[in-house]
Structures are given as C-alpha cells and as structure tokens.
Amino acid sequence: MRTAQKLESPTFLQWVRAPQQARSRAALNALLDAAERLVSERGFEETSVTDITETARTSVGSFYRRFKDKRGLLQALHERFCADARATADVALDPTRWADATANEMVDAIARFLVDIVRERRGLARAFLVSGASDPVVRERDVLLSDYLTDRLAACLESHRSELAHDDLRLAARITLLLLTSTLSHAAVLGPAELDIDDPVSATELSRAACRYLGSELPTDSNR
C-alpha cells in the first residue's frame, strides 16, 4: 500500500524515456544504453569502445558503422538525453501535477529530483559539461533545453504565484534552475571534496536555497 501511495504522490518523480521506434533503433539503443551506464559510472575518458560493445553485446565494427568515434557517440548520448529531459519535464513540470501541493513541496521535490538525476549520471553530466565548452551543437542543445525547462517551471510557479516573492516568475524559474544545475554540474566535475551529492544533507541544503530564493521555506517534513 505504501508503494502505491508513493507512486501516486506528485512529489514522486521519475526519469522518462522519450518514445523510440522499437525495431529500427534497437541496436542503436543497446549501444547508447550501455554507453550511458558505463560513462555515468566511470566517466567518458575511462570508458572504451570495447567496454561499450561488450556491454551492449555487439561488435566493435557495429559501433563504427554508427559512429565515427567516441565523440560521435557522445553527441548521440546528448541528443537522447535532451529528448528524455523534455519528456521528463512534460510529466514532472506539469502544473496540474502540483495543483494540491504547496509551492515549497513542489520546489523541494523538483530540487531533490535534479540531485538524483545528476548523482545517478555524474560521469555523463561531467562529459556533457566538458563537451559543451567546445562543441557548438551540444551548447545549442543545452540552451534550447534550458529554455524549455524554464518555461515549464515558470508555468508551475505561476500556479503558486500567491505563495512566492517574485513578480517575474520566468526569470525566477531560470535563476532557480541555474542555481541548482550550476551547483550540481560543479559537484559532478570537482567531486565530493567540493560538494558530496551522495550526502542527503547536500540535497536538503540545495532545496532550502531554492525555496528561500523563491520566498518560501522547506516543507516541515523535508529535513531528511
């Protein structure tokens, strides 16, 4: 019963895969799934093409028929990640989802969800950040994704305007996302010596910072 109640709660957020063409993309997705898992765990430079193909149960030749090199693979991973992030935002940042929640409950859940996403994919987040510094395609996708997430979060904040201390909620949404994602990206690159995102206290304090910026406080049961 508790599991069912948790799944029904608006604060229970999950990563969503964007729709795929099952058969035509099966082999490609096997490579991308393997690469995403390995890069998330080990990092991009530490993951070899052989590691990826062995995990995907395919051949090195099959890899190079699809990608010129590992950088081409990273491009494909980033493209899929951005599509999945949009699909996830459509669910997680749907204002109707939060109709019966308070603003601080909503912001707390979203902040913790972002921590979970980066914690589970820290090697991938690090690779995307480094790639975006020199790859204009990755950088442009990041900008478009940021705009999309900002619009979605702004719509959620708009439905709780009376609880918040901002007039320009789109700007508030952008700064909230920058506060969270920039801190988490920094942690992904520099590791636990800078900020230990495996420590639940880090998630609590990031959530507190986001809530207070928006003029709210943490939910009373959120100091966990």
PLM region spans:
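Helix-turn-helix
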Residues: 30, 38-72
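Short hydrophobic clusters on alpha-helical segments that form packing/core surfaces
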Residues: 31-39, 85, 114, 180, ...
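Alpha-helical DNA-contacting segments of helix-turn-helix folds
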Residues: 74-81, 132, 149
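Hydrophobic alpha-helical bundle segments that form small-molecule/ligand-binding pockets
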Residues: 91-100, 120-126, 131-136, 146-173, ...
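Hydrophobic/aromatic-rich alpha-helical bundle segments in the mid-to-C-terminal region
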Residues: 126, 139, 159-208, 220-224
